[in-house]
C-alpha cells in the first residue's frame, strides 16, 4: 500500500488533465501534508498545460485564520482560482489552473452532455443544469486575494493547520467563516452574470437560484436582464413573484430573531 502523495510523486510530470483532492480533515496526521504548499506545487507539476486541480476545503472545525491560511496557500500555487460552495454551504471547492478558467453555462453544458457519468454525479447533488452549477459559485480570485492578504502559509516545515485547527474542532465556525470570507463583497460579486451570454440564459440562472431559495440573487439577475430587455414578458411575470418570496423569507427571519426560547421552554 502507498499514500496519495507518494503515488503522485512517482507519476511523470504533465500526466493529468484533472486532479481532484478530497482527503479527510486537514489537521489529521498523515493527511495534513496534503494541504501544504509543497504538495500543491507537486500536484501542479503533474498536470498537463491547462490542467485543473480541484480541492475540497471544509468550513467547519477551524477558525477563519486557518481558512485564510489554506486559501492563501492554494492561491500562491495557481495563477487562476475560482471558489465554489457545496451542498448547504458546508464546504468549499477550490478550482485552480495556470490557464484561464472557462466558466460559462455553455461550457458546463457541453461537458454534461458529453459525459453522462458527470451529469449523473452532478444531478445527485441537485445540479441538473449548467445554471445549477453556477449557483454554487462564490467569488472570483480578486476577492479571495483580499480575504487571504497577510495570512500565514501552510508548509511541510510548519504544518500550521495540523497544530492550529484542532483548537477549534468543537466550535461552530462555519457561519462565521462564510461571513468573513464574503465580508466586503457585494451580492453582485457572488453572482457570475458574465457566465451566461444572453437574456434567456440570465432568466435560467435566476430560476436556478430560486431552486436554492436564493431569491435575492435571482432578483439581481433578473434586474440585469431587464436592463437589456425591459419589455421581456418572462421577466415581467417572474420579478414580482421573486420579490414576494424574498419578502416572505425576510419576514420569517425577523420572526425567528424576535422569538427566544428560555430553558423552561417558554418563549418571549
Segment roles from a protein language model:
Residues 3-10, 32, 61, 83-239, ...:
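Soluble small-group transferase modules, centered on the S-adenosyl donor enzyme superfamily
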Residues 1-71, 75-77, 195, 211, ...:
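The AdoMet/dcAdoMet-binding core of the Class I SAM-like
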Residues 43-44, 48, 68-72, 99, ...:
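Short alpha-helical interface elements
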Residues 236-268:
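Terminal, low-structured helical/coil segments at or just beyond the last alpha-helical repeat
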Amino acid at each position: 500500500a502507498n499514500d496519495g502523495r507518494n503515488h503522485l510523486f512517482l507519476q511523470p510530470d504533465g500526466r493529468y488533465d484533472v486532479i481532484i483532492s478530497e482527503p479527510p480533515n486537514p489537521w489529521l496526521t498523515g493527511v495534513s501534508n496534503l494541504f501544504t504548499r509543497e504538495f500543491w506545487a507537486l500536484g501542479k507539476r503533474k498536470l498537463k498545460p491547462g490542467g485543473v486541480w480541484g480541492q475540497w476545503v471544509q468550513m467547519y472545525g477551524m477558525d477563519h485564520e486557518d481558512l485564510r491560511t489554506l486559501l492563501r496557500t492554494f492561491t500562491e500555487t495557481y495563477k487562476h482560482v475560482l471558489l465554489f460552495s457545496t451542498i448547504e454551504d458546508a464546504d468549499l471547492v477550490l478550482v485552480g489552473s495556470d490557464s484561464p478558467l472557462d466558466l460559462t453555462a455553455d461550457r458546463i453544458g457541453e461537458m454534461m452532455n458529453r459525459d453522462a457519468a458527470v451529469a449523473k454525479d452532478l444531478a445527485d447533488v441537485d445540479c441538473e443544469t449548467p445554471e445549477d452549477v453556477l449557483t454554487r459559485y462564490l467569488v472570483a480570485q480578486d476577492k479571495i486575494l483580499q480575504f487571504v492578504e497577510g495570512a500565514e502559509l501552510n508548509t511541510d516545515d510548519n504544518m500550521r493547520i495540523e497544530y492550529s485547527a484542532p483548537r477549534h474542532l468543537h466550535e461552530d465556525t462555519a457561519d462565521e467563516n462564510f461571513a468573513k470570507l464574503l465580508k466586503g463583497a457585494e451580492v453582485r460579486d457572488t453572482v457570475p452574470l458574465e457566465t451566461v451570454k444572453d437574456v434567456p440564459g440570465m432568466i435560467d440562472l435566476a430560476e436556478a437560484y430560486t431552486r436554492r431559495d436564493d431569491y435575492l440573487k435571482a432578483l439581481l439577475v433578473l434586474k440585469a436582464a431587464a436592463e437589456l430587455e425591459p419589455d421581456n414578458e418572462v421577466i415581467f411575470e417572474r420579478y414580482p413573484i421573486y420579490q414576494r418570496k424574498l419578502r416572505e423569507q425576510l419576514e420569517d427571519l425577523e420572526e425567528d430573531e424576535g422569538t427566544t426560547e428560555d430553558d423552561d421552554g417558554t418563549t418571549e
